[in-house]
């Protein structure tokens, strides 16, 4: 079966995502569309608004055929690590295409930029070092260096950045996957405004989550229904500020609670400790700690990894192949899974897999902890703390 891969978060699934899915099917003619989706925490360092099982259901009801999990360690990380994890999974699955949205909408341009990034010529390294010395954050320094060596005036907006990273890893891994891009329509990735049309960003939906009538027309009916069910059942919405007291507890009990954590350098733990007890919320704390070098999303990811007690470093992640776990599938997806089961070892039952495959224990332990921490903010949290072991992949028959 010819398979098209998409890399998603669906936080939550909105009309822009449906457009991306429909265009993917149209331009590839694929027999099946497989999604690699973030779990309960997302790339920008926030909890998903509802859990991964609800978002898997949204995906399947709207026409995705199989949903695979992007493990926490990759999902809540830099664009480079996020992209590596997702492309590694799609490589293992042997998909024919990866189709992603971008602000540029120009695959030739993105490929040209990715070539510089994939092979890091001396000229690129020289300018990167210069811009880092000037005090820019790593993402900004890299953006400036890429513009300098490529002589392209591309805007390094979130989806362009991820698209370049996907292509970079396709090049570095000598992958046979063909990258394709669809020009993003409607609002920018992090635009907080709902606007008057049917398209808006997931950010805008999350910021207006307490006024459900306002967001109804921005989401496909199936997605809106699932979101309503989750909220009415007390399993959402979950937000970053919900976890502020957990960080306060860690700061009170463990003075050096950040020192050994993921991505903490240059005395950053001291800045956190200096401001945490005078802050009224996580947003307040982050506004005090943020610097030119440490972006808001980077700080949020640091806090999330602290919350989950993740000490795994990027170098290890970039030399490790992530596990392949099925979150859900439809009838076409079932046929696809049957067609690859002889060559791809994928997880459907977590408990039995852990016992047989100890090499993935550290990644799976992080995933389990992340899911349990996410569940602590549900109304009846005690019912969901073991959900990782109880929940089998969701099956929804295809509407063919």
Curated annotation (Swiss-Prot):
For the keyword NAD, the answer is no
Q: Which GO terms describe its biological process?
A: tRNA modification
| Catalyses which reaction(s) | cytidine(34) in elongator tRNA(Met) + acetate + ATP = N(4)-acetylcytidine(34) in elongator tRNA(Met) + AMP + diphosphate
Principal location listed in the UniProt entry: cytoplasm
Q: Which gene encodes it?
A: tmcAL
Coiled-coil positions: none
Q: What does this protein do?
A: Catalyzes the formation of N(4)-acetylcytidine (ac(4)C) at the wobble position of elongator tRNA(Met), using acetate and ATP as substrates. First activates an acetate ion to form acetyladenylate (Ac-AMP) and then transfers the acetyl group to tRNA to form ac(4)C34.
What EC identifiers does the entry list? 6.3.4.-
Organism of derivation: Caldicellulosiruptor saccharolyticus (strain ATCC 43494 / DSM 8903 / Tp8T 6331)
Any one Pfam family here would be HIGH_NTase1
Give the superkingdom in one word: Bacteria
Note the InterPro entries from the entry.
Rossmann-like_a/b/a_fold (IPR014729), tRNA(Met)_cyd_acetate_ligase (IPR008513)
This protein's GO cellular component annotations are:
cytoplasm
What protein name does the entry list? Answer: tRNA(Met) cytidine acetate ligase
Q: Which HAMAP family match?
A: TmcAL
Arranged from A to Z, the UniProt key words for this protein are: ATP-binding, Cytoplasm, Ligase, Nucleotide-binding, RNA-binding, tRNA processing, tRNA-binding
Q: Which residues bind ATP?
A: 7-20, 101, 159, 184
MF (Gene Ontology): ATP binding; ligase activity, forming carbon-nitrogen bonds; tRNA binding
Q: Which family does it belong to?
A: Belongs to the TmcAL family.
Places the protein is found: Cytoplasm
């Amino acid at each position: 079966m010819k398979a098209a891969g998409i890399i998603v978060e669906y936080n939550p699934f909105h009309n822009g995502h449906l457009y991306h899915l429909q265009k993917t099917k149209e331009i590839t003619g694929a027999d099946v569309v497989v999604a690699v989706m973030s779990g309960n925490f997302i790339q920008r360092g926030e909890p998903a608004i509802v859990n991964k099982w609800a978002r898997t259901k949204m995906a399947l009801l709207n026409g995705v055929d199989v949903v695979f999990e992007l493990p926490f360690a990759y999902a809540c990380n830099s664009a480079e690590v996020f992209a590596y994890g997702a492309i590694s999974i799609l490589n293992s699955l042997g998909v024919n295409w990866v189709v992603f949205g971008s602000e540029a909408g120009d695959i030739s341009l993105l490929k040209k930029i990715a070539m510089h990034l994939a092979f890091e010529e001396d000229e690129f390294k020289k300018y990167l070092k210069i811009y880092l010395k000037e005090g820019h954050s790593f993402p900004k320094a890299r953006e400036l260096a890429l513009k300098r060596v490529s002589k392209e005036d591309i805007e390094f907006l979130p989806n362009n950045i991820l698209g370049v990273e996907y292509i970079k890893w396709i090049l570095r891994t000598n992958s046979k996957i063909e990258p394709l891009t669809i020009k993003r329509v409607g609002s920018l990735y992090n635009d907080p405004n709902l606007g008057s049309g049917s398209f808006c960003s997931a950010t805008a939906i999350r910021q207006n989550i307490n006024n459900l009538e306002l967001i109804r027309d921005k989401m496909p009916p199936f997605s809106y229904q699932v979101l309503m069910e989750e909220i009415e059942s007390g399993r959402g919405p979950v937000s970053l500020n919900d976890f502020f007291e957990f960080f306060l507890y860690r700061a009170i009990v463990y003075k050096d609670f950040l020192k050994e954590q993921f991505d903490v350098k240059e005395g950053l733990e001291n800045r956190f400790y200096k401001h945490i007890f005078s802050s009224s919320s996580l947003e307040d704390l982050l506004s005090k700690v943020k610097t030119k070098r440490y972006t808001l999303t980077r700080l949020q990811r640091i806090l999330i990894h602290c919350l989950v007690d993740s000490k795994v470093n990027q170098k290890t992640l970039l030399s490790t192949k992530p596990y392949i776990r099925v979150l859900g599938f439809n009838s076409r997806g079932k046929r696809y899974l049957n067609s690859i089961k002889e060559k791809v070892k994928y997880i459907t039952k977590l408990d039995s897999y852990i016992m047989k495959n100890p090499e993935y224990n550290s990644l799976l332990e992080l995933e389990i902890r992340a899911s349990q921490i996410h569940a602590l903010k549900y109304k009846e949290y005690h019912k969901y703390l073991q959900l990782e072991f109880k929940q089998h992949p969701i099956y929804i028959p295809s509407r063919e």
